[in-house]
Swiss-Prot record:
Any one of the GO BP annotations: thiamine biosynthetic process
Keyword Nucleotidyltransferase annotated: no
Cofactor descriptive note: Binds 1 Mg(2+) ion per subunit. Binds 1 thiamine pyrophosphate per subunit.
Alphabetized PROSITE patterns for the sequence: TRANSKETOLASE_1, TRANSKETOLASE_2
Family from the record: Belongs to the transketolase family. DXPS subfamily.
GO cellular component: cytosol
Identification of the protein by name: 1-deoxy-D-xylulose-5-phosphate synthase
Names of required cofactors: Mg(2+); thiamine diphosphate
Protein keywords: Isoprene biosynthesis, Magnesium, Metal-binding, Thiamine biosynthesis, Thiamine pyrophosphate, Transferase
EC number(s) recorded for this UniProt protein: 2.2.1.7
List of residues binding Mg(2+): D142, N171
Role description: Catalyzes the acyloin condensation reaction between C atoms 2 and 3 of pyruvate and glyceraldehyde 3-phosphate to yield 1-deoxy-D-xylulose-5-phosphate (DXP).
GO-annotated molecular function: 1-deoxy-D-xylulose-5-phosphate synthase activity; magnesium ion binding; thiamine pyrophosphate binding
Amino acid sequence: MSKKFAHTQEELEKLSLKELENLAASMREKIIQVVSKNGGHLSSNLGAVELSIAMHLVFDAKKDPFIFDVSHQSYTHKLLSGKEEIFDTLRQINGLSGYTKPSEGDYFVAGHSSTSISLAVGACKAIALKGEKRIPVALIGDGALSAGMAYEALNELGDSKFPCVILLNDNEMSISKPIGAISKYLSQAMATQFYQSFKKRIAKMLDILPDSATYMAKRFEESFKLITPGLLFEELGLEYIGPIDGHNLGEIISALKQAKAMQKPCVIHAQTIKGKGYALAEGKHAKWHGVGAFDIDSGESVKKSDTKKSATEIFSKNLLDLASKYENIVGVTAAMPSGTGLDKLIEKYPNRFWDVAIAEQHAVTSMAAMAKEGFKPFIAIYSTFLQRAYDQVIHDCAIMNLNVVFAMDRAGIVGEDGETHQGVFDLSFLAPLPNFTLLAPRDEQMMQNIMEYAYLHQGPIALRYPRGSFILDKEFNPCEIKLGKAQWLVKNNSEIAFLGYGQGVAKAWQVLRALQEMNNNANLIDLIFAKPLDEELLCELAKKSKIWFIFSENVKIGGIESLINNFLQKYDLHVKVVSFEYEDKFIEHGKTSEVEKNLEKDVNSLLTKVLKFYH
């Protein structure tokens, strides 16, 4: 184990403040160096270096549960925990995850937002039942604190009185936005020592004053709370320390020791700078949040420029065109304006498109109400994050049969973010819902046609599209979109047929081209719709082709294979179905091409499997 970064609690305690600051600086250099090569979450990690070091110094990482919300800011924790020798493999195939994972020695898996405080509450209960003296420490950002689940957990935690520390990393991504300059001024004015000493003086005053004066003093204290940052937490029954400087190690360590000694639930409010220590990233939240490989000196991406537009860019442009054409189109995203491409629409139509922060449930239900009022909502959301609003999809959209469009970005394998972010379940959890229509474009032109159709469609409808660019460009002529109608792209008398869905059409075409070079052939169908299927076309196909290969970027269970088998059973058709969808296991991180090769879903592996059926 390397000793440059890895430190036990005892070793950290022996370091002087200057040595700790030097350690923080070295860690920043290491993080910048590795992320510049591998990509990753840069600015959030640079902003949390001192917080992580202080956590490891005041608490025992070997026994106290360290819970990182989302955990994209856990790089310093990884280095302190002895991962330096494999840190260069960050986010690479078979390498170190960019998030926390129990298989790497972490307390709990994370990747989605706002779970940390609930985990801390559960850990508190378990520790109490075991009669142990451990203290959970949850590090959560102010952006993650905007989600309802965090407040549900705070509500119970404040009533429980369990020893627990919530370290709030406030980099002004959410908390400071609502009241802007006033909030910033008050946060600076209410320095920690002043606020804490004021509360102590009030407490002493209440002990000695007569009842009438006590009443007035309490009223004064309550009025004072209205302009202090800790009001919310104290009203929920939590102790509050802060705001403190999240880059001042002495101040953070002191606050953590104070919270630890309280033996109560306590929130420490630390103000940090996202991107701290890398001048090009400081203050530029969105640009440096999640990055690809870049040149450290210039900050410019080192990735070869892709002249093809991403599916997200295509969606954004098409929605802009539709919004200018149809004034009843509205839209929402949950804290992903740039990631979903909705930022362009929020900028142009601020009264029709909204970012509601990390609030997927609220996003869906609020748009359901707008649909009820005659508007046409487009909900722009990552496939993996729609999971967080499943009840709202059913209860508030499907049952009501409302005209809502779900635009699911990052469908399929997303690469380096790993199992918490792979978009491979949406087809399985949406297909069973009555009233729902599901479809996917294979290329840019079909995306445009599908979005136009989605606007005109009556009832809830969901389209899925990949991270990055479509593989196909103009290999096939687009078709008019009609409900439940597929497109026969390559038609012949082969007994073998390829059925593609979305990006899966491209994979099927790549395999088919390789087969054609070997003087083999197959029918190629773009399903377009997963629900409803084109039963007329499939019945015709079943007369000539008795072996169907499924190309779709979803898990097998509940995916296209399941839907096709249901169709075949319905009409008592006898066809052999071979699915190239994903197996029943979570897909880990790595470059998409490498992950596909590991899963034997790359073109060469698929070709090898298909060739076994040719004689």
